[in-house]
Amino acid sequence: VANSDDGFGTTVGLESTGIYTEQDARGFSPLKAGNLRVDGVYFDIIGTMPSRLKQSTGIRIGFAAESYPFQAPTGVVEQRLRPFPEKNGISLGANLVSYGGKIGEIDLRLRNEAGTLGLVAGFAYSDFRYGGGSRVSSYTMAARPIIRIGGIEIGPWAAKTIVSFQQPHVLTIVSGDTVPAVPEQRIYLGQDWTRTRLNNDNYGLTAKVPITARLLFRGGMNYSNGDRERYFSEFYILPPTGFVARHRVIADPPQQIDAVSGEAQLIYRFDSGKWVHRLIGGFRMRSRLTETGGSQAFDFGTVEYDKPDLEDKPTFQFGPVNSGRVRQSAFMLGYLGRLPGVGHINIGVQKARFRASNRNGTTGAVTTSRDDPWLYNATIGVNVTPAISLYFGTQRGLEDSGTAPDLATNRNEQLPPTRTTQYDGGIRWKFGGGQLVVNAFQITKPYFSYDTSNLFTRIGDVRHRGIEASLSGHFGKRLQIVAGALALQPRVSNVTPTAGQQGELPTGTPSKYVRIDSNYKTDIFGGLTLTAGLQYTGTRAVSAKPFDSLGGKQLMLPGVTTIDLGVRQQFTLGGVPMNLRAVLANVFDHTSWKVLAPNVLDIDERRRFSLTLVADL
């Protein structure tokens, strides 16, 4: 809460605030859309940047994106790397997390006396456990040396994550007009032999180089890979009526995903009177290889739903894998102007180039696609009074569409990027100690779902139209609040005949979402802080098709409200500053489902306790 500027999304370490995350902003995923920026530089990263390198993650939309060059329609995920150390030190962290999981962390900070050489590095072991009984264990190692000489800052990094033990979430597939009860907590319905093993490596560099007093170079490169040695999906398919489910497992052969990406910008700053101007010219690129296919499916027949069905490990006979290559680049030109006390302008144009090819591992046939669009962004902001500001903007981008779900015939295939358009505007009121923001937006893009042959492909268009609000600030000397709310109207249109019968609601997208986080500082123990959080997730569609038995409507999940309570205490032990944090999440143990894809359900998390102790040496 203390590190949040608004209620739209901030993550520091294991804690987050706001209604949006890198996986969900205005109903879409800005991370899957390819809108990650690391210290302001574009990267196409497999997975996510390890926490040992990250200082924070913020979702930049609306007013929070007003100074961002080349804004993106689905929003920008801004990740800040750990900065040059102010002093030498070591941080040790011990975390007890949900359902008995644990995390151990050590972070190192070193610098020389001259302030020209620094190092941030870390190691972590994590053992996460989930409400459905699955478990993930991993090791992460990361290091980032930093060189600062005469205003130049260059910071290479290397990070490696080894997932040594990962049980897949066992999914439930519904085909009728009812949703089953959530299975008993912490009963794993999967197999002992479906353990996934994978490696994730990230190597990169960022650089800021002042060329003259007005001209600055900013850029970076990154290599990222995800080496999947073993990968499984397990699910139970429920018939339209009854609770005798079909049990299936899909196994994948070893597959490789890797990406090289980067960006270079030249920024020229000059003034004219009170106006501050920035001209930006740049180039960004990526080249991504994705292997898919060769999978083997196992059908273990019908079993009683929500009871473990242990099967013997079968013999695997995988097929050849498919190989997909995406090459994308853009030349960019932008202008940012600001007149203090009056307003700002942010304009950008990009000439993008997209090329993709996919080689079928079985037939050897190669398919290709291409696009050469012009992209743009334009935002104008006006300071009506010193306390009240307005903004209006539009963006058109070429954004990624993610990958096909595990149950599709084109399982894990990289979906083609799509042209996305957004219009938005908002008002901000700054008051003593805080601010209130209200925005309205509309985003349109192609819609991907299953067709009648179970291929996950484009079947129409989707529009998200909504209003979002954020209230953040200090209310008195003790109370701090970060609150956000979203009212969304998602709609699917222009559905192709090959999609079969489709409803107007995209699956899994809630109509409303509210999150409130608060801190209240007391005088107990010299400053014990009480924390509380509330989350409300509105109704969302489970099925793509409507049912006559439901009055021609789609199968829906009801809204759910959860409450979190916690405490935070800072103290000194033996001269060592320490921070203790305890949280009881979902206090009243509400049960619910998550919708991952049409008719695909996963168990949402239930009541759980976490305890964190951090020492700064």
Predicted regions and their residues:
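Face-selective signature of the C-terminal outer-membrane beta-barrel domain
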Residues: 199-227, 246-361, 383
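Transmembrane beta-barrel wall of Gram-negative outer-membrane proteins
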Residues: 89-91, 95-170, 193-216
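Surface-exposed extracellular loop regions of Gram-negative outer-membrane beta-barrel proteins
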Residues: 164-177, 287-296, 353-355, 381-424, ...
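Gram-negative outer-membrane beta-barrel transporters
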Residues: 341-342, 440-444, 458-545, 591, ...
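Conserved C-terminal beta-signal and adjacent last beta-strands/turns
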Residues: 279, 507-617
